[in-house]
């Protein structure tokens, strides 16, 4: 595809499926896999009684450090027999510093591989890791469902969600290595307005751009016959046999941080296939 540095972030034991998928993708891409093991201190020292904060703070940091070191040891043992190039690093952060720590790693990765941040199997810090990778790190992220994914064949049939936004176009450009290698790419345009800049040819300019890159692209104009765009896209993915969705990641502001907007969260909560997103 063209992704030569792949990053995955592990924050708790048991994220085996995510690590295995990242390994398989690195092997397929002949990429270097960077694994970042993070111990997160969730304590709020401001709530401790006077005189105890310094001791309790250090105790909490020590616990997080021990957890990070244990994660690193476990990951190294799992990667030792693998025939890929890999590196593992561990670090500790308080919850408020996770975003900066993750963003520093994500900004130099070609692709970040993470598990779905919602549902009973999600790691407690998964949403914060995803938001930091996307919005502060500026990296494209492949979000995997909790079920096993056949990474070796991933991206044969790709559904692209197109709504003329800057975010969608940026995601598509970051996904070009996937799209160029795919057997079929379908540009899904849901309920387009006849008064939009694309007028009577929704998706036409995008299809032309992709075709010039050698992408085997078609357009599907879909009526919004279900309550949400997410449901329309998921139904189309099932009908077309798509094994990956490419879409823009939309954000809203929370103080100085960007967090996922409702539409992006809604899709990730309900997606049954891998989603490659960027902003």
Label each residue range with its predicted role.
Residues 24-26, 101-150, 236-279:
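Gly/Ser-rich helix-loop-strand patches that form or flank binding pockets
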Residues 55-70:
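A short acidic, glycine-rich active-site loop
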Residues 12-13, 62, 92-95, 118-120, ...:
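Short histidine/acidic/glycine/proline-rich micro-motifs that form metal-
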Residues 18, 98, 126, 168-171, ...:
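Amphipathic coiled-coil/heptad-repeat helices and related helical stalk/stem segments
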Residues 43, 96-98, 121, 151, ...:
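Generic structural signal for helix capping and beta-alpha/helix-loop junctions
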Residues 1-57, 136, 146, 154-222:
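Small/aliphatic-rich secondary-structure junction motif
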Residues 77-112, 212-245, 251-255, 273:
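Structural beta-alpha unit
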């Amino acid at each position: 595809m063209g992704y030569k540095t792949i990053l995955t972030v592990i924050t708790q034991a048991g994220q085996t499926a995510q690590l295995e998928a990242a390994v398989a993708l690195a092997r397929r891409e002949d990429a270097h896999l960077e694994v970042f093991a993070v111990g997160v201190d969730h304590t709020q020292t401001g709530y401790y009684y006077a005189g105890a904060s310094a001791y309790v703070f250090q105790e909490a940091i020590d616990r997080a450090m021990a957890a990070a070191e244990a994660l690193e040891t476990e990951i190294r043992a799992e990667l030792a027999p693998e025939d890929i190039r890999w590196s593992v690093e561990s670090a500790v952060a308080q919850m408020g510093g996770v975003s900066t720590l993750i963003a520093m790693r994500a900004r130099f990765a070609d692709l970040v591989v993470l598990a779905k941040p919602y549902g009973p199997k999600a790691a407690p810090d998964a949403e914060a890791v995803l938001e930091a990778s996307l919005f502060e790190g500026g990296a494209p992220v492949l979000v995997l469902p909790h079920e096993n994914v056949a990474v070796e064949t991933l991206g044969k049939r790709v559904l692209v969600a197109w709504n003329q936004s800057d975010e969608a176009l940026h995601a598509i450009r970051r996904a070009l290595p996937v799209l160029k290698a795919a057997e079929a790419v379908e540009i899904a345009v849901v309920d387009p307005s006849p008064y939009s800049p694309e007028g009577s040819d929704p998706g036409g300019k995008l299809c032309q751009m992709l075709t010039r890159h050698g992408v085997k692209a078609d357009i599907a104009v879909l009526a919004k016959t279900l309550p949400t765009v997410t449901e329309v896209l998921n139904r189309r993915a099932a009908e077309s046999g798509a094994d990956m969705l490419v879409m823009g990641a939309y954000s809203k502001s929370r103080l100085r941080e960007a967090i996922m907007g409702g539409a992006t969260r809604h899709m990730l909560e309900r997606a049954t296939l891998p989603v490659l997103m960027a902003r």
